[in-house]
């Protein structure tokens, strides 16, 4: 299980690296999907299934709309690939910063905390991640509806901006 968690963590870092050093939005969406799937799988393996599902829906529902909008506006005939020197430089600098953070965190003794899952707290009849579901739908229903209407409005705004002068996504910016 430890090796599986380390593998998921490595894939999550690589997905974040793909999003941070994306040469064009075409490749950034691949990194976003990888990072969100692996991050939600990481939470799922810790036992937080509801939060994992909500984050998966939010990331793939909300952030992919932003990437579709940016892809439609970035009409690059020759997009840069991940093998270009500028993109490789971004990736190497990102890995150097992560390694420096790991060294500083190791020297400060931040690795002694361990991992606590939602089932390891004691004898509860309801798991900790499901105890907030009732509060989410009862007390948070107003903000839930406001967020839904905001996302719907954002969708219409993005569609109107992309439409432009009835040229669709083909127009050059």
Curated annotation (Swiss-Prot):
MF-aspect GO terms: NADH dehydrogenase (ubiquinone) activity
Subcellular location field:
Mitochondrion membrane
Q: What Pfam family is a match for this entry?
A: Oxidored_q3
Does DNA-binding appear among the keywords?
A: no
What InterPro entries does this protein map onto? ComplexI_Subunit6, NADH_UbQ/plastoQ_OxRdtase_su6, Nuo/plastoQ_OxRdtase_6_NuoJ
Catalytic activity entry: a ubiquinone + NADH + 5 H(+)(in) = a ubiquinol + NAD(+) + 4 H(+)(out)
Query: What is the protein's membrane topology class?
Result: Multi-pass membrane protein
Is Electron transport among this UniProt entry's keywords?
yes
Q: Which UniProt keywords apply?
A: Electron transport, Membrane, Mitochondrion, NAD, Respiratory chain, Translocase, Transmembrane, Transmembrane helix, Transport, Ubiquinone
Extract one GO cellular component term from the record.
mitochondrial membrane
Task: Report the EC code(s) recorded for this entry.
Answer: 7.1.1.2
Protein task? Core subunit of the mitochondrial membrane respiratory chain NADH dehydrogenase (Complex I) that is believed to belong to the minimal assembly required for catalysis. Complex I functions in the transfer of electrons from NADH to the respiratory chain. The immediate electron acceptor for the enzyme is believed to be ubiquinone.
Protein name according to UniProt: NADH-ubiquinone oxidoreductase chain 6
């Amino acid at each position: 299980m430890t090796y599986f968690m380390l593998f998921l963590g490595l894939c999550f870092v690589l997905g974040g690296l793909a999003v941070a050093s994306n040469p064009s939005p075409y490749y950034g969406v691949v990194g976003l999907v990888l990072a969100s799937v692996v991050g939600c799988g990481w939470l799922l393996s810790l036992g937080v299934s509801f939060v994992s599902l909500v984050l998966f829906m939010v990331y793939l529902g909300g952030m992919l709309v932003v990437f579709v909008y940016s892809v439609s506006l970035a009409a690059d005939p020759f997009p840069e690939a991940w093998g270009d020197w500028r993109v490789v430089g971004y990736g190497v600098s990102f890995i150097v910063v992560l390694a420096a953070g790991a060294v500083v965190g190791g020297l400060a003794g931040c690795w002694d905390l361990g991992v606590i899952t939602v089932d390891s707290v004691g004898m509860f009849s309801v798991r900790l991640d499901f105890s907030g579901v009732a509060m989410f739908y009862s007390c948070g229903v107003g903000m839930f509806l406001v967020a839904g209407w905001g996302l719907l409005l954002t969708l219409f705004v993005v569609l109107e901006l992309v439409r432009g002068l009835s040229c669709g996504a083909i127009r050059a910016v």
